[in-house]
């Protein structure tokens, strides 16, 4: 595959995001809908796919102590700046939160279980009329903008008649045409200058981690760091990762560099690699190459599991990605990277997702621990063999199988998780 296609996919899948991306996506949608209509808000209706609804259900809104779909939508309309994309709530003020709290009776949330992939629609009714937006497939991918039933913007190639996926989604799916040896060959041989941009994720996510070490969220990262000696890069990796996620899910007004639409995925696929780099005094080039591998494996799995799923994509998909990156950074061969992925597939695949919330750092810690264990096993010639569980004869089929566990495998599980969450909130 042309290396420029791979690089473009990496660039497209990587972007800054403030807070968990599902409430950010809802806020962006309502911000754009209000932007085109203006006036005094009478009602906001949000229609979302079940996965997006679940992930935003109990997640903190950046810069506030508020949580959930309703507040995300209201704040998007009240103070959101759609030009900032997933950082649309960057300018939030206390008075905006106070205003939103008085308007909770003006919002309706509907779950649309018939959509395929990520979907959020915002219909904002004001004294000036109705503004409407639809976001599809990616958290910031606005495909339709209407004002009083007149189309102001409609994205071309939004639907592909053969499979109902956007052209952008099809581009990322090209990753799944690659064999693992081709992926590793790209990582080894691509010009460093062409992938140096990946280090931007390190700078952004490290700042978020430092914020989390102040004791945000459940304080897991801070707790782990307290027991970490100077040369223990594994515990340091857990601490960096968990503190960044602690900060993110608790509403810290500090962005993460997302990948495959998720800040948590972006954190897990990068910060453990930074921990190794720092403790072993490695150079930036090998770090960038390991991040490229981590990202690509994560993207590969997510193309089969979906952007949002019943399993914890952070621990499973991103965890598998970073396990490959860890093995690479520790000098692993192609075969050892392959065996690392097999070990991950055999371990925590199937860990459930209960949405973006304070438990995310706990699951992330499990994912990072499993990633290091899988790599260490592979580097010591310990591997789960083919035809054992979901490990297939080819590593590509094994990665596909990881995704299949989520979709279609756990679709009914996802529905039940959402039912439990809704019942528990009453």
Swiss-Prot record:
GO biological process: L-cysteine catabolic process to pyruvate
UniProt cross-references to Pfam families, sorted A to Z: SDH_alpha
Residues in coiled coil: none
Highest rank taxon of the organism: Bacteria
GO molecular function, one term: L-cysteine desulfhydrase activity
HAMAP family documented for this protein: UPF0597
Protein name per Swiss-Prot or TrEMBL: UPF0597 protein CLK_1197
Organism per entry: Clostridium botulinum (strain Loch Maree / Type A3)
């Amino acid at each position: 595959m042309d290396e420029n296609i791979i690089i473009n996919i990496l660039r497209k899948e990587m972007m800054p995001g403030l807070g968990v991306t599902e409430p950010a996506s809802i806020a962006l949608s309502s911000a754009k809908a209000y932007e085109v209509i203006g006036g005094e808000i009478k009602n906001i209706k949000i229609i979302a796919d079940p996965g997006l609804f679940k992930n935003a259900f109990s997640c903190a809104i950046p810069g506030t102590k508020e949580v959930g779909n309703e507040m995300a939508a209201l704040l998007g309309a009240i103070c959101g700046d759609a030009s900032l994309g997933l950082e649309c709530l960057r300018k939030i003020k206390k008075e905006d939160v106070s205003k939103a709290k008085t308007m909770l009776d003006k919002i309706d949330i509907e779950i649309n279980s018939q959509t395929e992939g990520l979907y959020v629609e915002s219909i904002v009714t004001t004294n000036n009329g109705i503004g409407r937006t639809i976001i599809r497939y990616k958290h910031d991918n606005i495909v339709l903008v209407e004002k009083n039933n007149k189309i102001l913007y409609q994205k071309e190639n939004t639907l592909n008649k053969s499979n109902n996926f956007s052209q952008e989604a099809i581009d990322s799916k090209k990753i799944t045409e690659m064999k693992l040896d081709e992926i590793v060959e790209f990582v080894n041989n691509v010009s460093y200058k062409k992938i140096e941009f990946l280090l931007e994720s390190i700078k952004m996510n490290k700042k978020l981690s430092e914020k989390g070490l102040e004791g945000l969220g459940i304080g897991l990262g801070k707790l782990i760091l307290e027991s970490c000696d100077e040369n223990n890069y594994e515990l340091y990796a857990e601490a960096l990762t968990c503190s960044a996620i602690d900060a993110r899910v608790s509403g810290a007004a500090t962005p993460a560099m997302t990948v495959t639409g998720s800040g948590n995925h972006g954190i897990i696929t990068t910060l453990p690699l930074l921990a190794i780099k720092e403790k072993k005094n490695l150079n930036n080039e090998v770090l960038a190459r390991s991040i490229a591998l981590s990202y690509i494996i994560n993207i590969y799995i997510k193309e089969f599991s979906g952007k949002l799923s019943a399993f914890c994509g952070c621990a499973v998909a991103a965890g598998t990605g970073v396990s490959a990156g860890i093995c690479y950074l520790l000098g692993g061969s192609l075969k050892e990277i392959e065996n690392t992925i097999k070990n991950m597939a055999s371990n925590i695949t199937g860990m459930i997702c209960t949405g973006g919330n304070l438990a995310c750092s706990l699951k992330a810690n499990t994912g990072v621990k499993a990633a290091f264990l899988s790599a260490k096993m592979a580097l010591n010639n310990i591997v789960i063999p083919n035809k054992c569980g979901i490990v297939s004869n080819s590593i590509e089929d094994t990665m596909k199988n990881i995704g299949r566990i989520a979709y279609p495998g756990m679709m009914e599980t996802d529905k039940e998780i959402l039912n439990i969450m809704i019942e528990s909130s009453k």
